[in-house]
């Protein structure tokens, strides 16, 4: 049997058995993933069952106790509170660009972990991501210190527009519908803009996210700690939470309503996530995985307002989520240079093409493969 057909047969079998990942067969199927009642806290519980952190915090193959450090954590106590008992390797790597941070871990070292990491991703010193992170750290020194004020002004402006339009919608008789529309659009834009602040240290703007009736704390789990770190894998909560209504993972036994997900999504979920599954290494560099799993939009990345309110500069944002969106455009040259050097599969598209693409993903039942030379 040709290698491609053989792999597809094995992948289909793994998908049906649900004992391991399809693309990463060395990993067990995520605990609690298919429970009918799903929420961020349950996702954390399932992760704790699989990570071998023994009630502590795991970074790579070592266990640490940050209990005495929690209140002193520069990013806020909440991050450590949420992740206790889990493997935080990806979160630690992505959220700490300064190389001196890793040296501080020695103060809290307890012992080596007893089990291998339940993650396929690597962070080798000469790999794509760590090389990029070192280059970004140096590049940040050349970026104006006040550049993030642009995002602050945009966010504050949208917030004030929401307050004014909401007040007028309730107060005036004429043009009330117009003010309703302005308030609704402002709330939608503000919700996305606040996403910029949820990734970072505790700050007042992240609480504005709650005006959407979503919880910023839950979003920190499902989006920041799950989707950002395990993008488009079985461990991605933003994939598993949509099931059994939407199925982005390909499977031959996908139910009819799953194949008609482009209809379901307009009824159940307002945000679109493009999924791209290609055959890759079973232990990929984390940064290269992010580049492969995401598409940037050339019609969005050229405008600071659009970048902030429409999830722009998505590839760089996924790899350096704590950086303000206004900073990311300065990192394009070094990012593209290293993508070429490491032959990372960086791709750009348009907003329209991505909307069409994510609809096609909900309808797909077969695996995508590529020829490996």
Where are these regions (language model features)?
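B-type heme-binding environments
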Residues: 1-142
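Intrinsically disordered, low-complexity segments enriched in polar/charged residues with Gly/Pro
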Residues: 41-44, 67, 176-178, 204-208, ...
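A broadly tuned preference for mixed-charge, low-complexity surface segments
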Residues: 109-118, 361-373
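Short, flexible loop/turn segments with low-complexity composition
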Residues: 117-119, 150-152, 347-353
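Amphipathic alpha-helical surface "interface" segments used
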Residues: 120-129, 153-161, 245-252, 357-364
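Well-ordered mid-protein domain cores that form the structural environment of catalytic cofactors
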Residues: 134-138, 142-213
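Membrane-embedded catalytic scaffold of the fatty acid hydroxylase/desaturase
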Residues: 182-371
């Amino acid at each position: 049997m040709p290698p491609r057909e053989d792999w597809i047969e094995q992948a289909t079998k793994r998908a049906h058995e649900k004992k391991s990942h399809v693309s990463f067969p060395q990993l067990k199927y995520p605990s609690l993933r298919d429970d009918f009642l799903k929420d961020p806290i349950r996702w954390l519980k399932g992760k704790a069952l699989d990570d071998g952190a023994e009630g502590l915090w795991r970074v790579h193959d070592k266990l640490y106790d940050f209990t005495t450090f929690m209140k002193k954590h520069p990013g806020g106590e909440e991050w450590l509170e949420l992740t206790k008992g889990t493997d935080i390797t990806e979160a630690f790597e992505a959220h700490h660009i300064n190389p001196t941070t890793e040296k501080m871990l020695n103060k809290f070292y307890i012992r080596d972990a007893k089990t291998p990491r339940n993650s396929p991703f690597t962070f080798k010193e000469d790999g794509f991501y760590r090389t990029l992170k070192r280059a970004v750290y140096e590049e940040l020194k050349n970026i104006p210190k006040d550049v993030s004020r642009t995002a602050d002004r945009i966010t504050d402006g949208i917030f004030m527009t929401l307050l004014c339009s909401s007040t007028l919608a309730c107060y005036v008789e004429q043009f009330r519908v117009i003010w309703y529309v302005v308030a609704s659009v402002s709330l939608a834009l503000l919700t996305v803009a606040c996403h910029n602040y949820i990734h970072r240290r505790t700050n007042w703007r992240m609480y504005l996210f709650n005006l959407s009736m979503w919880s910023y704390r839950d979003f920190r789990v499902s989006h920041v700690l799950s989707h950002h770190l395990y993008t488009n894998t079985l461990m991605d909560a933003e994939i598993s939470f949509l099931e059994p209504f939407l199925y982005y993972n390909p499977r031959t036994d996908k139910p009819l309503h799953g194949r008609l997900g482009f209809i379901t999504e307009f009824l159940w979920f307002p945000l679109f996530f493009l999924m791209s599954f290609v055959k890759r290494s079973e232990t990929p560099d984390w940064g290269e995985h992010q580049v492969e799993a995401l598409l940037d939009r050339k019609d969005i990345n050229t405008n600071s307002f659009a970048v902030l309110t429409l999830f722009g500069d998505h590839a760089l944002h996924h790899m350096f989520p704590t950086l303000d969106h206004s900073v990311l455009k300065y990192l394009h040259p070094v990012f593209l240079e290293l993508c070429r050097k490491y032959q990372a599969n960086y791709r750009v598209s348009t907003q329209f093409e991505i909307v069409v693409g994510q609809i096609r993903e909900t309808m797909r039942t077969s695996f995508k493969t590529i020829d490996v030379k």
